[in-house]
């Protein structure tokens, strides 16, 4: 008695092929499938196999046999296709454990041409065939064959062929591959059709148009127990991408002092015109203090740089490289560099001047005007009209000495009002008396002497 995967009652023999003397159906060759498809064409709608090896001529090898199950596709290079002992045989209703033996066959898929003209080879897809069927129907279990991986249930006898009929795509659709609980899927591979509702819906729509018998088979397929092996492709691919980028998918990356210092140093190592200020490297560290020659940026924008929420709308006004070079006035100026003890090198400045013109029809015009008015010459507004050039912080010892000096200056000390008063206060010599008498006789009062001092 031959078993038919997906059917609870496997007692009926399949008529999809002629039976040989040993009770095993003959192989259904690629030519047989092509002829059958051509004969069915005059019925109005040609039956197409579902989830089978490719039937189109391509640069890869053509698989002339239809697997009972959907394939397993490789999506990550460098990974080996393998299962642990006793695992890897797809489960299907109607197949006893003793018949769960066979092999996975690697199908090398076609290559395609990329937009830049290069040929790229698609990663292979693997299909399962029961022992004694498929491309290597005559092989003995365990034979070393390139592109073949043998699997069997622990209760199966691998010395005899599996009594399983080969699939006729016009009568049986491929069964979505499912494994027994505890099966570990090879890393870097995913099951075709796993976790998707589209194949089920398409199967349902086809079963409605094919009559009650096919609907019964379709419903029996849907009653298969769900496998614990359900790889979520979205999570796997996201994890691979994050790992490639050096990020942890589990936790958000925290910015430490060390990482912020590294980011800041990386920015400052770039040429001045290539720097992008942000929270880790503020505007003034990148481009210096605000003043007449660098007059844009309020206090908040100076801290955040391009991370400021208002900056993106300003970036819409920034010229493109083409507009910068072809729409500006440029002048190349040679500058002196270094001191007497430094090596001489030629330094040039590409000085430019230009204008960016826009009008009230520009999207976000009012917001742009508001942000510009808040940040243009903001250094003057915040300092009451005085240029903001922050003095260098004084050291503690120098500041204490300055405070002590101020205290001494605050002490009141009597001081003479003029040098003449200081001269009057001292004792006069005979020469001074003679000179003073002569001046008084002439009636001339020297500066600084008045009646109160006489």
Curated annotation (Swiss-Prot):
Which key words tag this protein in UniProt? ADP-ribosylation, Host Golgi apparatus, Phosphoprotein, Ribonucleoprotein, RNA-binding, Transcription, Transcription regulation, Viral nucleoprotein, Virion
Residues reported in the UniProt entry to bind RNA: 109, 125, 167
Annotated region described as RNA-binding, given as residue ranges:
56-197
Query: Got a GO cellular component term for this one?
Result: host cell endoplasmic reticulum-Golgi intermediate compartment
Describe the subunit structure. Homooligomer. Both monomeric and oligomeric forms interact with RNA. Interacts with protein M. Interacts with NSP3; this interaction serves to tether the genome to the newly translated replicase-transcriptase complex at a very early stage of infection.
Q: Where in the cell is it found?
A: Virion; Host endoplasmic reticulum-Golgi intermediate compartment; Host Golgi apparatus
Q: Give residue spans, biased composition: Low complexity.
A: 11-21, 193-227
- Region (Dimerization): which ranges? 267-384
Q: Where are the stretches annotated Disordered?
A: 1-62, 186-230, 271-292, 385-428
SUPFAM superfamilies assigned to the protein according to its UniProt record, in alphabetical order: Coronavirus RNA-binding domain, Nucleocapsid protein dimerization domain
Positions carrying Phosphothreonine are 177, 429
Q: Which residues carry this modification: Phosphoserine?
A: 170, 194, 390, 425
The CoV N NTD domain sits at: 64-193
Q: How is it modified after translation?
A: ADP-ribosylated. The ADP-ribosylation is retained in the virion during infection. Phosphorylated on serine and threonine residues.
Regions of biased composition (Polar residues) lie at 49-61
Provide the CoV N CTD domain boundaries: 260-383
Family as reported in the entry's similarity comment: Belongs to the betacoronavirus nucleocapsid protein family.
Give the matching InterPro entries. Answer: N_prot_C_CoV (IPR044344), N_prot_N_CoV (IPR044345), NCAP_bCoV (IPR043505), Nucleocap_CoV (IPR001218), Nucleocapsid_C (IPR037179), Nucleocapsid_N (IPR037195)
Any GO MF annotation of the entry: RNA binding
> What protein is this chain from?
Nucleoprotein
Q: What does this protein do?
A: Packages the positive strand viral genome RNA into a helical ribonucleocapsid (RNP) and plays a fundamental role during virion assembly through its interactions with the viral genome and membrane protein M. Plays an important role in enhancing the efficiency of subgenomic viral RNA transcription as well as viral replication.
